[in-house]
A protein has these predicted regions:
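Glycine-centered structural positions embedded in regular secondary structure
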Residues: 45-47, 128, 168
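Short hydrophobic-aromatic micro-motifs
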Residues: 50, 55-58, 100, 127
């Protein structure tokens, strides 16, 4: 989930990486973020509740898994299998986005949705439920061989077990249109900076 001026777990730079697991003070919609458990795996994929039983997620989640249930705020809801609707762009091309309805209605959590693209240099808060990160930094050479801190040109975090809903902050560094193999969309990029502060974040695998 993305909100301006405000997506699954995100990776944060601060501490041991386990922080920010409850709603931020200036909450842009924590209660609207849920997840789908992918079949035959122990992983989940992020969904956002829009209201009136409608959810949105990446189309590739539906393509690979055809999920039957969604979990939101601790409760599980069955998906109406006839409600899946793929989103198209104004040009008529398919986007990597799909909406669906649940059979029963979740609580009504108000959600504000932007009517325009997020501009460059805008501050964003990301909420997601993707993979966790390792406690300590790992280091790589310029050829991406694993090394130690003394020989490292690049540093970052490798994946850890499990996933956790988490939030973080970043700044939009650029925008572009792209095809991810499942549809065309307008997107934006953020950079995971070492000096970005304890809430500096980047989206993780399964943050779809």
């Amino acid at each position: 989930m993305l909100a301006a001026g405000s997506i699954r777990a995100v990776i944060i730079s601060g501490g041991d990486g386990t922080g920010n697991a409850s709603a931020p003070a200036d909450d842009p919609g924590w209660a609207n973020v849920g997840h789908i458990k992918l079949a035959n795996t122990n992983t989940v994929s992020t969904v956002t509740y829009l209201g009136d039983r409608w959810f949105i997620t990446a189309y590739h989640v539906k393509y690979f898994d055809n999920p039957q249930q969604v979990k939101l705020a601790g409760s599980v809801y069955s998906i109406n299998s006839n409600s899946w609707t793929r989103i198209t762009n104004s040009t008529g091309t398919n986007a990597d986005l799909v909406v669906f309805q649940t059979v029963t209605r979740p609580p009504n959590f108000p959600l504000r949705i932007r009517s325009s693209q997020i501009p460059n240099s805008a501050n964003v808060v990301m909420i997601g439920d993707g993979r966790n990160r390792a406690t300590n930094l790992s280091y790589w050479t310029s050829g991406w061989a694993v090394t130690n801190s003394a020989g490292g040109v690049y540093s970052g975090y490798v994946w850890a077990a499990g996933s956790t809903m988490r939030w973080g902050q970043n700044t939009v560094s650029s925008r572009s249109s792209f095809d991810d193999g499942f549809g065309f969309q307008n997107g934006f990029q953020t950079t995971f900076n070492a000096n970005g502060g304890s809430n500096e974040c980047q989206a993780a695998t399964y943050d779809s």
